[in-house]
Amino acid sequence: PGDYGHMELVYDFSAGGDADGWLHALFRYEDRASGHAAETSFGAHVFNTVLTYKGEPQSYAGRPPGLSTRLFLRLGPAPFDTLCHLIYPASTPWHGESATDLELHDAKGREVARRRIAIPCSGSFLFRYGETFDAKTRDRAGDGAYIIIRDLTCRLFGYHGLLRRDGGFSFDHMFGF
């Protein structure tokens, strides 16, 4: 990989000033050859930081945000391959890199395999199920398998979808809690 990436929209408070609202955006992705298109909206969030903004702690359940990730990654049936683009956003500097586990489970919830990846702070990682786990491991996982994406060092964000030779389908974004 190397021909992928992501974009972060941030307010720069280094020179002072004040934000007049949360950043929001609507993105449309289109494959010019196939005509396949996908849209997603994204509202601003404060990621991987312990801070108070305008007198409000940026926390979701009493704890500082950004301390962990638990995502469910649906795996498509053959002939589809599943893709996932994980992003490690940071509103202020956080850990230098993630310690992210991709835990492959069979349909009964038993862990079949685990792979550790490291995503740089403000970086991203694109992977496909078929390239991440070998054929023997995928066969052991069987139909109905899924991946749990787990990280105890940071909160990740991501996109996921299904691919096949003649096209693909993009699902909405994923948040890590």
Regions picked out by a protein language model, each given a short descriptive name:
Residues 1-177:
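Gly/Pro-rich, tryptophan- and cysteine-flecked surface segments typical
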